Amino acid sequence: MASPYRRDYRRSPYFKSTFKLNLYQKFRKYCLKYDEKTGNIIDLNSNKKALIFSFDESAFQFVGNYIKVISLTKPQLTTDTNRYSCKAAGFYSLTPEGKDYITFMENSTKETIKNLFKDIRKQNPKEIIFLLIDNFSSHKANIVKNLAKELNIELCYLPPYSPQLQPIEKVWYKNKRDNMQYKIDKIKNFKKMDKDEKLNKLKEIIENSFYKTVKSKTMWNKVLNEYIKPPIKKLHPRYNSEVKLEIVN
């Protein structure tokens, strides 16, 4: 079980209300209906499905911060003390039809973020995309916002200093916990590999762990029920009833 987030004095006491308002302003551009049975969100104006993704980057380091050794004799070093690190970017779908996606990158510049947006659009070519994203400087660059508008990607910025509202943070937490150093030591012939082979192997482990973790949709239930469903139902309550909508020309 993950430990709770510490209170950040920089975070506004109204961060939850701010997040709901941000989503409300994005959703009001469309005529969305949430299907309780399938979990899908549909825009009734265009008859397209709406997908909600949680997007963030994370750095992975494959050594522990410290190693405790208790021995009455001279201890034998069995751990690779070299540093191997890489940076991953992930799109975690909060809707059943969305295709989760993870990739690795060298930096987090605005050009890199633009390429990531193009990748997620290729993975989901026809749907409307709402992206939960933090306030990192590259995420708020004008060229990134302009590209998102061209690709029909709605950027839903989180309130500052509120990682608990970002579902993919729990995915990264579990991913790092599952790939601790003691498991890496068990990889066959790991010590005999060169640096590039080790990094490729570790990236493979991260990718497999990511797709395995995102199959469990319980991580985002709280965000979905508390923040995403209410604005949709508040904007268009009649579309969430049993009454069928008839359009008269």
Predicted regions and their residues:
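C-terminal anion-handling pockets and recognition modules
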Residues: 47-50, 168-249
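Short, conserved catalytic/metal-binding motifs centered on acidic residues
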Residues: 53-59, 92, 133-135, 166-169
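The start of beta-strands in P-loop NTPase/AAA+ ATPase cores
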Residues: 51, 129-130
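Acidic, metal-coordinating catalytic cores used for nucleic-acid/nucleotide bond scission
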Residues: 61, 131-144, 160-165
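Electropositive, glycine- and tryptophan-enriched low-complexity nucleic-acid-binding patches
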Residues: 63-64, 73-127
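RNase H-like polynucleotidyl transferase catalytic core
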Residues: 76-82, 149-167, 184-185
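A short acidic, amphipathic alpha-helical/loop segment
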Residues: 116-119, 143-147
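Charge-mixed, compositionally biased segments that are often intrinsically disordered regulatory tracts
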Residues: 1-84, 231, 243-249
